[in-house]
């Protein structure tokens, strides 16, 4: 009898990541369908505004997952080696994207232009997220050190609130339109640090991982509906017909924090014993980076092909369900294939580096006669949790369940 070994991943976190993955494609539907150019009138505008805000949480959710899983990462070589698979994924998808542009879109640029787009991680159409992630990943050990130096829950709660206030609250307030003759917006709260909004979501993820707040699923769903309705209505009543004429909530708005938080809390603590389902969820969530980046090709293909079929709000929902399901299936299939092709390369590059780190750490810190057990999260030389996905496992879950099939 063959035995299946359950993945170390937290199933609930895999669900959050899968939701974020599929939200990427769903959000881009609104970008390419002409939604932002439509006149915001009627119930359809509010309904689709709620859908947009639901899917807009994809990037905040990814960052919160990073905070949740990397909360104990420390400054050491092993931490930075874990970034290599992400870089390889971006470069690989960049090459695929270049081939698509050359052979399918008939684009022609000098080789140096193509190369520059690769080494700046801009070639995959959505490579901006890789630029964000690299920067965040580089400073994670120092963020963790600062956060973990706070001794009490009260201090850490205050840190979360103040960070959100400094990096996001100002944007939300200053953006409120007044449409006055001399004053167009309120604009009285300093927003110089608004670019730090990713750190706000990262710290929220750390906080959830440490204190594991609980809220019933039906309350999460109800509060989520209320917040989505609030954002959609707020935009609707402040707009002058055009979407961008109103309050257009984005990632850096603090109003988005409770929405992302509610989605996270709805899924993150779900547990199941069905090992095949857990394995499937782990495999899907592991390809999130490739899935995100590859989706640009599908977006370009589908929305170019179906552009003439969009007829405003009258068929927006129908077009959503016509494009998004098949887009998800094809993008996921391509991601799993590319993932499998890149996995040996990632292991070939990272495995020797991890061994070198382990030897260096062992030489610098000889084991005591009666060693104290050290958790996986406290050991910079332990690369046992590193596969293709640098965030595929929790730091504390090392249990392996088996079932006969």
What spans do the regions from the language model cover?
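Alpha-helical transmembrane segments and their immediate juxtamembrane cytosolic regions
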Residues: 1-371, 375-380, 388-391, 400-405
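Active-site anion-handling motifs in enzyme catalytic cores
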Residues: 397
């Amino acid at each position: 009898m063959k035995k299946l070994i359950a993945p170390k991943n937290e199933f609930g976190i895999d669900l959050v990541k899968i939701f974020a993955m599929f939200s990427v494609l769903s959000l881009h539907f609104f970008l390419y369908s002409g939604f932002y150019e439509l006149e915001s009138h009627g119930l359809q505008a509010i309904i689709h505004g709620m859908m947009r805000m639901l899917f807009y949480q994809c990037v905040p959710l990814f960052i919160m997952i990073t905070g949740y899983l990397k909360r104990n990462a420390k400054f050491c070589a092993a931490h930075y080696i874990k970034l290599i698979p992400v870089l390889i994924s971006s470069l690989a998808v960049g090459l695929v994207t270049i081939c698509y542009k050359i052979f399918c879109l008939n684009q022609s640029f000098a080789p140096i232009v193509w190369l520059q787009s690769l080494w700046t991680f801009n070639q995959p159409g959505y490579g901006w997220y890789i630029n964000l992630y690299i920067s965040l990943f580089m400073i994670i050990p120092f963020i963790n050190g600062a956060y973990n130096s706070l001794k009490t829950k009260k201090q850490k709660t205050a840190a979360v609130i103040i960070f959100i206030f400094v990096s996001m609250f100002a944007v939300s307030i200053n953006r409120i339109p007044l449409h006055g003759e001399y004053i167009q917006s309120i604009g009285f709260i300093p927003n110089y640090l608004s670019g730090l909004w990713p750190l706000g979501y990262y710290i929220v993820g750390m906080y959830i991982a440490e204190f594991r707040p609980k809220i019933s699923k039906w309350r999460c769903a109800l509060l989520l509906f209320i917040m989505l309705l609030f954002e959609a209505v707020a935009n609707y009543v402040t707009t002058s017909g055009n979407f961008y004429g109103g309050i257009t909530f984005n990632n850096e708005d603090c109003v988005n924090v409770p929405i992302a938080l509610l989605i996270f809390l709805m899924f993150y603590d779900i547990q199941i014993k069905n090992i095949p389902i857990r394995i499937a969820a782990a495999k899907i969530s592991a390809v999130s980076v490739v899935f995100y980046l590859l989706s640009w090709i599908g977006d370009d293909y589908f929305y170019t092909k179906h552009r003439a079929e969009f007829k405003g709000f009258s068929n927006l929902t129908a077009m959503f369900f016509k494009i998004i399901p098949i887009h998800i299936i094809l993008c996921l299939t391509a991601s799993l294939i590319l993932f499998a092709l890149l996995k040996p390369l990632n292991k070939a590059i990272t495995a020797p580096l991890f061994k070198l780190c382990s030897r260096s750490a062992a030489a610098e810190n000889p084991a005591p006669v009666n060693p104290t057990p050290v958790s996986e999260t406290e050991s910079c030389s332990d690369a046992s949790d590193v596969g293709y996905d640098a965030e595929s496992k929790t730091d504390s879950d090392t249990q392996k369940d088996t079932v006969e099939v």
